[in-house]
């Protein structure tokens, strides 16, 4: 069984920011050869973290772990207040313009092909459903179906180039579809910080488009939701497990 607790603290007053400790995730995991089974509230990370990097409640299954061809399947429930759209949903609830539930059914699969240490190919499919919220409040199709593909190439061990494109379906106007129903990511990086290796570091330059409905919970810190542009950054491991 694995778990993670999150808490906020104010170092100036040595007090918690909100007085609460939250259970971020807790799940049971079993590994049987190249098969991994997860049950509970567990993390999901799609290809390059563009579509989704977060926690969901349900079941997950990885087939072919650490092999050339692998697949990760997951199904369960996800609270959309934790998504990139969370602020808009919370504001609508507080204003009384939305009174329905915020939990969606979510199912997905990520297929991976790693023929060598230099090349990786990943394919995503994700289905998200909550009729009252998606259709009633956000005026998009229910369910939403996301699909996309990403690749990573390493010409040498310390340099990588990755890119990918993701899209969703909806019945919105052509103009809104054109501007908001897709996401893409292009990134060039050198090395990378290893949380178990103090002193390790990485730098990167990327051009990303995080479409308003083209992603659910993206992983990026610098690229904001519903924006397009350059991101330049890096990571450094100060101490073990401190990046």
Write out the residue ranges for each language-model feature.
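Outer membrane beta-barrel
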Residues: 1-88, 92, 101-125, 152, ...
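Short, contiguous, pocket-lining structural segments
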Residues: 99-103, 127, 139-146
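A conserved mid-domain beta-alpha-beta active-site/ligand-binding segment of alpha/beta enzyme cores
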Residues: 124-128, 133-135
């Amino acid at each position: 069984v694995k778990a993670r607790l999150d808490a906020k603290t104010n170092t100036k007053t040595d007090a918690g920011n909100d007085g609460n400790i939250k259970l971020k995730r807790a799940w049971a995991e079993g590994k049987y050869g190249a098969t991994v089974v997860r049950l509970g509230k567990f993390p999901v990370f799609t290809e390059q973290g563009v579509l989704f990097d977060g926690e969901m409640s349900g079941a997950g299954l990885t087939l072919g772990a650490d092999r050339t061809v692998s697949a990760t399947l997951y199904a369960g429930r996800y609270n959309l207040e934790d998504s990139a759209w969370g602020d808009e949903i919370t504001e609508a609830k507080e204003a009384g313009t939305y009174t329905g539930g915020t939990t969606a059914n979510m199912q997905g699969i990520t297929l991976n092909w790693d023929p060598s240490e230099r090349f990786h190919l990943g394919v995503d499919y994700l289905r998200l459903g909550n009729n009252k919220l998606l259709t009633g409040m956000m005026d998009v199709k229910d369910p939403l179906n996301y699909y996309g593909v990403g690749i990573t190439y390493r010409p040498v061990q310390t340099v990588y180039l990755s890119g990918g494109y993701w899209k969703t379906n909806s019945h919105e106007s052509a103009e809104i579809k054109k501007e908001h129903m897709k996401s893409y990511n292009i990134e060039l990086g050198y090395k990378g910080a290893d949380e178990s290796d103090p002193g390790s570091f990485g730098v990167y330059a990327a051009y990303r488009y995080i479409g308003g409905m083209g992603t659910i919970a993206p992983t990026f810190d610098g690229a904001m939701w519903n924006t397009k542009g350059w991101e330049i950054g890096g990571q450094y491991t100060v101490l073990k497990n401190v990046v």
